[in-house]
Amino acid sequence: MIGAILAGGFGKRLKPLTDEIPKAMIQIKENYTILDRQIFDFRNLGIKDVIILSGYLGEKIEERYGKEMNGIKFTYLKEDKPLGTLESMRNLIKERSDSDVLLRNGDTVTDMNFKKFVEFSSGSPYDMTMFVTRMKSPFGIVDLLGDQIMSFREKPNLNHFINAGVYYIKKEALRYFSMEYFSKDIETTVFPKVAAERKAGAYFEDTLWLGIDSEKDLEQIRKEYVNRTDFPWGFKKRVFSSGERIMDDFYVRSEQSLSVEVTGPSVVRITGGRGKIFSSEEKMYSENDVMSVTSNFSLSPLENTRFTVMSF
């Protein structure tokens, strides 16, 4: 399996930030770009070869990563003028057609469990699998019963799914990209073709996902990354610190494990997920559980787990 990133967009709605760098090179925290995060995900999967499908200011990407970094070999396929994502994929196939491809749009950040995504996709009967996420309403929702207002919901998730910009494409499916189409983007050509042949699958996971397409999106992801550090198992974020009082927020992906050090009496609050916790004794945990601990503990999540630790 190889990794590939579609990073050729102009990022017009993010000007002037994209006047001198491509959108994928925008920082989501100090010295940590969108592309850094995506490559971090690839590295944690053990991917050794990554192809960057670039265009506008693509040389800036090559300057940052070079031919090899942190055990990953980079290949750059740069278009001098934008020809669409279909042509970008055709260029990739000319370079490599011997492996399955984990393809990403270069403007998304997600905490999805890539290991589970790859396991699901590679073992499925589908030629291509797409990560999907729930569509969020851009407006607040008013629930009515006749002419009576029953409740308000502020920008809830809707019962619709959208393309989240992460795709597992088996090498057998690469033939679809060589067919003749009347459009130049894979979303309006290859994907509908594969779906029509019932060879397209979907993978859903309820986790952070954000497409960074506007200043508002960028503000949201930068807020998320305040005091946050990513790890192969998830992330840790310092929420509060005053004297000896410290609160940390943790996110651990399912089928991972994490040992947590505490310096004294602490309270663990599970805000999502379920699994096993090992402290003075082994027991199951689930959402909304609150536990007191006085020594180091570890978790083995059965589901993606979010929890806070308040130390006194």
Predicted regions and their residues:
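A short glycine-rich, His/Asp/Glu-containing loop-to-beta-strand
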Residues: 233-264
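Catalytic-core segments of class I nucleotidyltransferases/pyrophosphorylases
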Residues: 101-102, 109, 115-122, 135-137, ...
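Short acidic-glycine-tyrosine-enriched beta hairpin
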Residues: 276-297
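A short, conserved acidic/glycine-rich loop-to-beta-strand motif
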Residues: 124-134
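N-terminal nucleotide-binding beta1-loop-alpha1 segment
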Residues: 1-19
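A short hydrophobic beta-strand segment most commonly corresponding to one strand
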Residues: 298-312
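Glycine- and acidic-residue-biased ligand/ion/polar-headgroup-sensing regions
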Residues: 263-280
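Conserved N-terminal catalytic core of the sugar/cofactor nucleotidyltransferase
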Residues: 2-5, 27-105, 114-116, 176-180
